[in-house]
Swiss-Prot record:
Native species: Haemophilus influenzae (strain ATCC 51907 / DSM 11121 / KW20 / Rd)
Domain of life: Bacteria
Basic and acidic residues biased stretches: 236-263
Region Disordered, residue ranges: 178-203, 236-272
GO molecular function, one term: metalloendopeptidase activity
Annotated protein name in UniProt: Uncharacterized protein HI_0756
InterPro entries xref list: Cell_wall_metabolism_enzyme (IPR050570), Dup_hybrid_motif (IPR011055), Peptidase_M23 (IPR016047)
PROSITE patterns on file: PROKAR_LIPOPROTEIN (PS51257)
Compositional bias (Polar residues): 178-187
Entry's Gene Ontology BP terms: septum digestion after cytokinesis
Low complexity composition-biased segments: 188-198
Amino acid sequence: MLRFGVNQKTSLLLTALLSCGLLIFSPVSQSSDLNQIQKQIKQQESKIEKQKREQAKLQANLKKHESKINSVEGELLETEISLKEIRKQIADADKQLKQLEKQEREQKARLTKQIDIIYRSGINPSLIERMFAQDPTKAERMKVYYQHLNQVRIEMINNLKATQAQIAVQKKAILSQQKNHRNQLSTQKKQQQALQKAQQEHQSTLNELNKNLALDQDKLNTLKANEQALRQEIQRAEQAAREQEKREREALAQRQKAEEKRTSKPYQPTVQERQLLNSTSGLGAAKKQYSLPVSGSILHTFGSIQAGEVRWKGMVIGASAGTPVKAIAAGRVILAGYLNGYGYMVIVKHGETDLSLYGFNQAVSVKVGQLVSAGQVIAQVGNTGEISRSALYFGISRKGTPVNPAGWVR
């Protein structure tokens, strides 16, 4: 006797029903399946929305921590400047103290010599009285000499006392400065601890963010969105810069016309005005004529794969956190702030068509609209944005298209 499993029985039953034309798909069955699919779609959409909210929250926390690091870095710079000034004051005070101590030793030596002269001469009031009885004229001369020696000795003693008083004041000042120095060091240590804590929080947030963005497609979408946001921000910033330059050039032309009319002499522009006039020149042809904005090893080259089909539109240079970032050429700052994916970003406009971009910074040192010169410090290397180690993102754009920066820098 043959035994059939459940699946075999079901299969035979379906075959029989189909052969008899008794099995049909009713509208009720189709509607149920559609409802189930729609339910699954809604659940998936809800899940995606939840992930997006979590990602937005993490991005906000990341920006908050990086802003805190930026603030603490500024405080550390101020403390370092203050400490340098205090150390200079202590060094100056110590130098003055050594001069006073040398002066004290010399005064003591002169006073000792003077006392020795008086002692060896044997001159004293009782001797002078006896000489008056014997030879008044000689006694008078001896009296004047004795008074002179005594006056010199008194002046030496007074000078020595004054020097010793100055030494006491100087030592007190040094002790006070040393106390201030210790307080400043303590403050700096606390600031460094606060910075380390903020960096740890930043790293923790970044790790959590990377975990949520583990899927390549999610990261790819994020990178595309960041890239698009950067393009839009550049377009907006370029337009604003063009309008600002136009206003400034018109104002300069009016000043030049008015000044030449008033003085009947050719107008001599200021340093800033000359910088404005020279800002029309771009970066020129790619001849490796500029220095790198920061020294370090090249972690990613232009055109190498960043994620999926997205490629790096610039180079990434590894460097220690806090390393000064320098503008490669003169120009106008059109962006100085935080951008998702790029962290604290500075973009400098060179002429009408060229831009240089500096990202992943932990702090920026310039403002939008500011004219900068070649080699001027504009930021500090960091690991803001979506990068796990301290490095600088450096790119060049010409006529709105990213180009390989390696052709311009050496």
